[in-house]
A protein has these predicted regions:
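N-terminal helix-turn-helix DNA-binding module of bacterial transcription factors
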Residues: 1-47, 318
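Central regulatory/effector-binding core of bacterial HTH transcription factors
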Residues: 70-116
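Flexible loop/turn connectors
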Residues: 217, 222-320
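Short, well-structured alpha-helical segments in soluble
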Residues: 89-102, 210-225
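Interdomain hinge and pocket-entrance segments immediately C-terminal to HTH DNA-binding domains
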Residues: 34, 43-57, 75-77
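Periplasmic-binding protein-like
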Residues: 102-110, 167-170, 202, 223-233, ...
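Flexible loop/hinge segments that line or gate small-molecule binding clefts
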Residues: 86, 109-153, 173-174, 195, ...
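Hinge/beta->alpha junction and helix N-cap segments in small-molecule ligand-binding domains
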Residues: 54-63, 81-90, 143-153, 169-215, ...
Length: 320
């Protein structure tokens, strides 16, 4: 019966599980792929979720994508990814293309967008979840951590350990708002103790171990009195740690180090770099649950989910 075939090919079709399995097995043997355009025309939506992220070249966003994919696995929804390279104009263009396909939802990194992109999100007519950050207003829902609080907590931990002459190493990409907020929170934490950053070293482009080595050598040559280096991410922090160890610098006695993100790469280092977990996989899962209508709150949209990262002192902050 044609109707049974149609229902069997739908994720939530009104047929028994045994019938569905027979239909799907027959389709597999025939190499048949259903044409979903007709259904999309009828519903004015496709079963796609637009996911817009700044990069796939670092270790952060692939784990976010894993969380999204895991949560959407049996919902009939499929994530489609667009990459912005931290460019607001590129984000605007990617969002325009995504929305032209009438997706069932949008997951987008960050809270800062161009006026045109913000207007498109506000008028999307589907669940919109801004991820990775909660330090600011959101269009619909947001899932992430407070980067200002993350920087603040790291500063307090460093000060408790007795470090006083502190340098910051990070990106100078003006559109990396989350790194900027962490630095603002970090400086606020230092100010609580009457301290301030004594030196800063910035880079442009992607994060890499080599960049971390070069930046660490540069800042310590310029300011050898520094006793702590706070890196904006784990990748450059790992490079800094390797440079210090190769040059016989006592870590964490002579100098302490910390990064951010809690990436798995740190498990392979000679010493564990102090870091803070950015809850990447959980952010992906919670965002996808909102889009799929599976939020534990029962709400569809209008949610603000703040996750709490964990500070791991590793082997590079002195024990208090």
């Amino acid at each position: 019966e044609p109707e049974i075939l149609i229902q069997g090919l739908r994720p939530r079709g009104d047929v028994s599980e045994a019938t569905r399995e027979r239909v799907l097995e027959a389709a597999r043997q025939l190499g048949y792929v259903p044409n979903k355009i007709a259904g999309a025309l009828a519903s004015q939506r496709v079963n796609l979720v637009g996911v817009i992220i700044p990069s796939l070249s670092n270790l952060v966003f692939p784990e976010v994508m894993s969380g999204i994919s895991e949560e959407l696995e049996d919902t009939g929804l499929q994530p489609v990814v667009g990459v912005t390279n931290y460019s607001p104009e590129r984000e605007e263009a990617v969002l325009y293309e995504m929305l032209s396909w009438r997706p069932s939802g949008v997951i987008i990194a960050g809270l800062e967008h161009t006026p045109a992109a913000a207007a498109m999100l506000e008028n999307a007519g589907v669940p919109v979840v801004e991820i990775m950050d909660v330090d600011g207003p959101c269009v619909d829902s947001c899932v992430g951590i407070s980067h200002k609080r993350a920087g603040l907590e790291m500063a307090r931990a460093i000060i408790r350990a007795g470090y006083k002459r502190i340098g910051f190493l990070g990106t100078k990409m003006p559109e990396d708002h989350r790194a900027r907020k962490r630095m603002e929170g970090f400086e606020a934490g230092l100010a609580e103790a009457g301290l301030a950053l004594e030196d800063r070293e910035f880079y442009s482009g992607g994060s890499a171990l080599k960049k971390g080595r070069e930046m660490t050598e540069t800042i310590l040559a310029r300011s050898p009195e520094l006793d702590f280096l706070y890196f904006s991410n784990d990748m450059i922090g790992a490079g800094g740690l390797l440079w210090c160890l190769e040059n016989g610098i006592d870590v964490p006695g002579r100098i302490g180090l910390a990064g951010f993100n809690g990436v798995d790469l740190l498990d392979g280092l000679p010493r564990r770099l102090a870091t803070m977990d950015s809850c990447r996989r959980e952010i992906g899962r919670r965002a996808a649950a909102i889009v799929a209508g599976r939020s534990p709150t029962g709400l569809v949209g209008g949610e603000r989910v703040e996750l709490t990262p964990t500070l791991d002192p590793g082997d590079t902050i002195r024990a208090v």
